[in-house]
Design a protein with these regions (language model features):
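Absolute protein N-terminus
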Residues: 1, 20-22, 185
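Serine-esterase "nucleophile elbow" of acetyl-processing enzymes
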Residues: 19-66, 76-84
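N-terminal signal peptide c-region/cleavage motif recognized by signal peptidases
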Residues: 13-15
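Bacterial N-terminal signal peptides that target proteins for export
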Residues: 1-7
Length: 214
């Protein structure tokens, strides 16, 4: 009798291991990967810390590959999308611009990625990017519209850009070099912190609205 009571007590008080934190896979390029930064200062780790500090446990999986395009992301997504993935963030497109990909190709690749995730009943959040003006107004207009168009067509969540807060400062005539690495392209740890403070509330809302977290 005592033995049975002890077993029951263990069952009632033991931690439950059948549940784990939701896993969010971030499919991206160098900013997601944490190019030029120690792992602890990279975007994924800082993102995890933001959620932890705000009382929400989420496991972010770093699917960033420096230099990757939407074509590369499309190739990687199917085998990266394991059964334990709760949601996918797609943050690709910058390297398509650098290589001069036609906007319609980028859109097609992103559309296929979204279809793959939705086909597996995995919610998707799309993070956009902006084309520079040196490709011409038509290219920039067509490219920049990809992400908002897809978000509407596929009925998915959308964040305009990782770098939106930095670009906003530039548009005000402010210098943001103190937030960038020596290459002038990739955010340094302070820049990543600015990015995380910008995207995290929007990401939190997405995870709540898709019932991934309460």
């Amino acid at each position: 009798m005592l033995h049975k009571a002890i077993i029951n007590l263990i069952i009632l008080t033991a931690p439950t291991f059948c549940y784990s934190d939701p896993k969010v896979f971030i499919l991206g390029d160098s900013i997601t990967h944490g190019f030029g930064l120690p792992e602890e200062e990279g975007l994924v780790n800082q993102l995890s810390n933001w959620f932890s500090n705000n009382g929400t446990a989420v496991s972010f999986i770093n699917g960033g590959v420096s230099g990757d395009t939407t074509a590369g992301g499309l190739e990687r997504l199917s085998w990266s999308l394991t059964e334990d993935i709760s949601a996918v963030i797609v943050a690709l497109g910058s390297n398509d611009v650098l290589r001069g990909f036609p906007p319609e190709i980028t859109k097609e690749n992103l559309s296929e990625m979204i279809d793959i995730a939705q086909g597996n009943k995995v919610p998707v959040l799309l993070i956009g990017t902006y084309a520079p003006g040196n490709y011409g107004e038509e290219y920039k207009s067509n490219f920049d519209a990809i992400f908002t168009d897809l978000a509407e067509e596929k009925n998915i969540a959308y964040i305009d850009s990782y770098l939106k807060p930095l670009l906003d400062e530039v548009s005000k005539g402010k210098d943001v070099m103190h937030l960038l690495q020596a290459d002038g392209l990739h955010p340094n740890p302070h820049g990543v912190r600015v990015v995380v403070e910008y995207i995290s509330p929007q990401l939190l809302k997405f995870l709540q609205e898709t019932n991934i977290i309460e």
